[in-house]
């Protein structure tokens, strides 16, 4: 397959342009060829060609430009570059959705799973994280992320947000135990307001209100003090969580090591 050098084709649409990286293909006739885009090309193309028809949501007319030598068998003496006037008609644009999320309070990483995600031209602008609201804590308390740093998707089905500072503190308080419900009995939820995916058609409401969150974390012990007079052992750690029903810790799992490496 080498009739058409696909890497010399550039798509133009919403917010800019993108040069394909998919493999070369053969023509199917004297008047046509087709390309099945690789995964990276699809993510970019879907962001540019984000609305059915011949123009993007921002009214940019779709175009495919072919740089010189795109038709590999043409004579070197003939200029075959074809840069303008090559419209693209788009169909079957899918509405992006969120389906679920997981949160690790050790790392602060929120991994969101969805369908039909695609990239926006530029860097760190695929997902507007200020549109994401988490529910948990007591009486279904909510918190909307405040970080000004937007992020890129990792694939057509997922993206991840690393929380820090005030965002992590607030989210840890809401998602305060492992599983899908808080110690206060609230079901964890992730809601995304409209326009959460930057490249989506602005005229289409893509808000997504109900998506479960599953919390996982590894509690850590950092130090301990012991009062010999009272027999009180006070343990300090991180990510300690309420059980939600029954004892929070199992003291039989603790082992003490003393001088001489003796243990109890």
Task: Put a short name on every predicted segment.
Residues 1-264:
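Non-catalytic beta-sheet/beta-sandwich ligand-binding modules that flank or precede catalytic cores
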